[in-house]
């Protein structure tokens, strides 16, 4: 019985796309804060000014803390989709930024998604990738973070009053922050087509589904058998072995 084959590159790209959002959000706020204060009445160097940036870290602590137990219950794919939704809502809320409270709450939401992505995505990519390619695939998340930071500085330049588009300072910063909603939407749409982690499927006793994912990713029945056996052994060791 044939199944529609999804390109491994597609899977790895969209699996790691959360890293781009992580990097973009990290870089874009430095440019946006030059103009946010004037519109919202935030004094430079004040507690309120610093907390706009720090609020993401507060959310990231929460996101990283809860993602592990949740991913073991709900699965990597489902939480990747939830993270994309949180990214999208946080990006739009930050870009609207009609008040200081809305901006901070939206940044906390972004932080939750950032923390979740930084803990979830490397694990997800490692569990999907063949053993001989795992190291290289694992670097994709970091590569995406760097790409996101680069794009953030490009957008900061283009959308600033003296930049390529020459937008008014009370308009440009909104767009700087809202642009993150585009890759967030792409992450959600692409994530719908991603497979579940075979390790998670094995943990849930869905051996046939796990084998099919490994077959799709590896295309080698011998390698599939080895990966499947390894996943089963790890599951038994973690959940059934009494030390």
Predicted regions span which residues?
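Transmembrane-helix signature of 12-pass secondary carriers
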Residues: 1-243
């Amino acid at each position: 019985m044939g199944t529609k084959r999804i390109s491994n590159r597609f899977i790895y790209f969209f699996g790691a796309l959360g890293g781009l959002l992580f990097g973009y959000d990290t870089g874009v706020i430095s440019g946006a804060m030059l103009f946010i204060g004037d519109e919202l009445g935030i004094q430079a160097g004040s507690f309120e000014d610093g907390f706009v940036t720090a609020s993401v870290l507060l959310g990231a602590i929460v996101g990283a803390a809860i993602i592990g137990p949740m991913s073991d219950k709900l699965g990597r794919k489902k939480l990747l989709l939830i993270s994309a939704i949180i990214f999208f809502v946080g990006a739009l809320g930050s870009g609207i930024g009609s008040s200081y409270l809305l901006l901070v709450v939206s940044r906390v939401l972004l932080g939750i998604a950032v923390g979740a992505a930084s803990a979830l995505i490397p694990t997800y990519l490692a569990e999907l990738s063949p053993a001989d390619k795992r190291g290289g695939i694992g670097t994709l998340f970091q590569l995406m973070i760097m790409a996101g930071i680069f794009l953030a500085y490009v957008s900061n330049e283009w959308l600033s009053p003296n930049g390529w588009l020459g937008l008014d300072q009370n308009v440009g910063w909104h767009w700087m922050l809202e642009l993150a909603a585009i890759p967030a939407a792409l992450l959600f749409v692409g994530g719908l087509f991603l497979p579940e982690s075979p390790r998670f499927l094995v943990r849930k006793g869905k051996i046939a589904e796990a084998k099919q994912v490994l077959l799709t990713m590896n295309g080698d029945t011998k390698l599939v058998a080895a990966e499947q056996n390894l996943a089963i052994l790890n599951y038994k060791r973690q959940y059934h072995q009494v030390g």
